[in-house]
Amino acid sequence: FLPIIASVAAKLIPSIVCRITKKC
């Protein structure tokens, strides 16, 4: 359960930061 959330968060967080800061 937790490993799945961690892996999803690891993919989502960088993309969110990428969109907000526009640094990819």
From Swiss-Prot:
Keyword ATP-binding tagged: no
GO cellular component: extracellular region
Cellular compartments annotated: Secreted
Disulfide bonds: 18-24
Pfam families registered for this protein in UniProt: Antimicrobial_1
Tissues expressing this chain: Expressed by the skin glands.
Keywords carried by this UniProt record: Amphibian defense peptide, Antibiotic, Antimicrobial, Cytolysis, Disulfide bond, Fungicide, Hemolysis, Secreted
The keyword Disulfide bond appears for this protein: yes
GO biological process: defense response to bacterium; defense response to fungus; killing of cells of another organism
Family to which this protein belongs: Belongs to the frog skin active peptide (FSAP) family. Brevinin subfamily.
Function: Antimicrobial peptide with activity against Gram-negative and Gram-positive bacteria and fungi. Also shows hemolytic activity.
Protein name as annotated: Brevinin-1SPc
Protein's organism: Lithobates septentrionalis
